[in-house]
Amino acid sequence: MIINGVHIDETFAEAFPMRATRVIVTAQNLKWAHHAAQAMTGFATSVIACGCEAGIERELDPAETPDGRPGVSALLFAMGGKGLAKQLETRAGQCVLTSPTSALFAGIVEGEQIPLGKNLRYFGDGFQISKRIGGKRYWRIPVMDGEFLCQETTGMIKAVGGGNFLILAESQPQALAACEAAIEAMRRIPNVIMPFPGGVVRSGSKVGSKYKTLPASTNDAFCPTLKGQTRTELSPEIESVMEIVIDGLSDADIAKAMRAGIEAACGLGAANGIRRISAGNYGGKLGPFLFHLREIMA
């Protein structure tokens, strides 16, 4: 398969089951909603070392938020429910409770309920007050700028993590330009995040390592500087490879985001140095969700 001169490899991405939640952060204005949400979703690129994977899903108009203020929705993913609940509580307490004018609400109603303000309320030292509105409980916690309003719980659902594709280009600037175009398109798709910095990964990994203590190591087959030292997947003209990783609330959401991103990257075409699209294929060792590139782009 070739799209605008870009070869689409006959391969697939592998992804794995996760647990996820969505929360809504509001504030006096969008700038401060972003400050809180960006802090809450920081250091959350990979569950390998960060405890969770998280990112901002989209901005919300006042008409879309529970308190009628500007806001953003954020998605958080972890391998299990206990881990997700702990990460959410820690991040909410350290990054949203602390942020001026912020409030925090559930973004998913269904599924197992995990604490949001249920435990954060104790920061109020007995001065906290609960309110029940429309069958939902909220906590008003006194803080120095006024009150922090936080919904008691949010819903946790089954989700999918680790969808991905690789962009292979003639140069680093060209690979990055294609990634930026892809991310811009993918951010229009609901229910997904691309958790790495700017949505892009340069240090793609393979399972295992020559060092016994490492569960993953550099994907040497796709490293352009190692063409003469390893079983390379790269042809001579490829000098840069970058990866986009996607977490989604369903496999269908990830497939939509992958299609949008690949279409955008291929829009630049071979004339702009984009030569191939591939994916992280680990022979079925990583996860049960398989995203075949050519099926997605058919």
From Swiss-Prot:
Its main location: cytoplasm. It catalyses: N-formylmethanofuran + 5,6,7,8-tetrahydromethanopterin + H(+) = N(5)-formyl-5,6,7,8-tetrahydromethanopterin + methanofuran. Its EC number is 2.3.1.101. Pathway: One-carbon metabolism; formaldehyde degradation; formate from formaldehyde (H(4)MPT route): step 4/5. Pfam families: FTR, FTR_C. GO terms for molecular function: formylmethanofuran-tetrahydromethanopterin N-formyltransferase activity. InterPro entries: ForMFR_H4MPT_ForTrfase, ForMFR_H4MPT_ForTrfase_C, ForMFR_H4MPT_ForTrfase_fd-like, ForMFR_H4MPT_ForTrfase_N. It is found in: Cytoplasm. One of its GO terms (biological process) is formaldehyde catabolic process. Homotetramer. Catalyzes the transfer of a formyl group from 5-formyl tetrahydromethanopterin (5-formyl-H(4)MPT) to methanofuran (MFR) to produce formylmethanofuran (formyl-MFR) and tetrahydromethanopterin (H(4)MPT). This is Formylmethanofuran--tetrahydromethanopterin formyltransferase. It comes from Methylococcus capsulatus (strain ATCC 33009 / NCIMB 11132 / Bath).
